[in-house]
Amino acid sequence: MMKIGADTKMLNFGLWKNSPTLYDAQKEMSQYITEFGEFNSAKKILDVGSGFCIPATIWKEKNPKLDIFCMDLNFSELKNGNNHIISQINSSSSEIPFFDKSFDRVIALESAQHFVPLERFFVEARRVLSDDGKLVLAIPVIKEGSLLKLGILNITWLSKKYTESYIKDTIKNTGFILRKEESIGSMVYEPFADYYIQNRKSLKEKLITTYSKRIEDLVFRSMKKMKEISEKKIIDYLLFSLDKSS
């Protein structure tokens, strides 16, 4: 829906440190991942759940020497990416169609919350990583035992609601080493919700050309709820950098 309302095909909430619009925030998030994931020392990257490949295009523009592969289960998004400088693969996160040790980075930028089972993705990511490779995640999480506190987001947040402890257990159980973690929820959810609320009139006009007014009202209520529970630390947004080996 935000693709229609805000004229952007990037499928992330954005990082709102220095960004006035959703597109700017999404670009800022994509650029920050290159720093967090240490792309400067990478050569070959697999972006899992890549959507329209726009973050990958940003990474390629910043470092033209990177060999980047976009992989997504949704063929229509890959097809509509109109990308001729990045390889595109239509496949599932649980069956990555590459040989062992093919990449030095595997990235899941706000996509791993859709992967079921998550453990299978971790196993596959570890398999295709080189011995000195890294798995980099940007993922929404909820506080332990807080499902009932999500309210309307239980309906409108169309993904798994993983907890930080579940993800860390999965990291340990699949043989990864947690090297770096960062909490950025306050720079994601609250400004994202504020952006929608402050620009609701113009965004609503665009949304109701495709969806009903009732759907837009659900979006608006979801934004208010998102801001509320982010301020209460019921939801967070975490970045993880994982080493394949010690």
Predicted regions and their residues:
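Conserved catalytic loop of SAM-dependent methyltransferase domains
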Residues: 180-207
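Conserved alpha-helix/loop element of class I SAM-dependent methyltransferases that forms part
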Residues: 23-41
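C-terminal lobe and adjacent flexible extensions of AdoMet/dcAdoMet transferase-like proteins
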Residues: 220-246
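Short alpha-helix
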Residues: 159-175
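Class I SAM-dependent methyltransferase SAM/SAH-binding core
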Residues: 46-95
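Short, glycine-/aromatic-enriched active-site segment of Class I SAM-dependent methyltransferases
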Residues: 140-159
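A short acidic, Gly/Pro-enriched loop at the edge of an enzyme's catalytic core
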Residues: 94-106
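A short glycine-rich, Lys/Arg-flanked "PGG" loop and its adjoining helix->strand segment in the class I
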Residues: 119-134
